[in-house]
Amino acid sequence: MKKTLMLQERKKSFPIRRSTFHHSTNTQISMSPQRKTPKIKIGWFTFSCCEDNTVVMTEVMNDHWQEWKELFDFRYARALQSKNVIDEFDIAFIEGAVTSENHGEKLKEIRAKSKKLVAVGACAVIGMPAGQRNAYKKKQKDEIEFLLTRFASLPKVLKVSDVVKVDAEVPGCPMDPNQFLEVVNRVVGELKKEAASKKL
């Protein structure tokens, strides 16, 4: 009885440690979690437009949600979430034309923080139909002058490429979902290729 109690006390003092070696190969198993590939940081920004491209984007996202949730980190997308940040983006998507000084300043800030910038939709790509006032006659311009002053509008509506460098474009009003997906895949491929070349 006394010997049994001594053995029990010894087991408490020296607990059995499980081996981290695989029995068949005698190779140590790593206990640390595998590193995941960093997600691609996305920003989705809207300027002067009807936002129909945002609708198309969300429809495409619904169809590709299972793959996109593993691939993308939406850092800024007000149509999708309430918490948004402007820090660093791998891809910034811009819809809408540039109609004010504030738009221009914000667009330049986004460009400076983005590896790739994609203009989506007609207003962003060609400045229309948001830029119809560019073709107004003097009388029409005089009639809307008070509105331009109130909203600190630019004298002329600009497309995105008038203000910053654009890496890719998806035209249309609204944009074609298949063409949008094609551009997304192409730009993602370019980013992956650039990342791989840096590792060499």
Map each language-model feature to its residues.
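Polybasic, lysine-rich low-complexity intrinsically disordered segments
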Residues: 2-4, 11-13, 26
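Iron-sulfur-associated redox domains of electron-transfer enzymes in respiratory
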Residues: 32-200
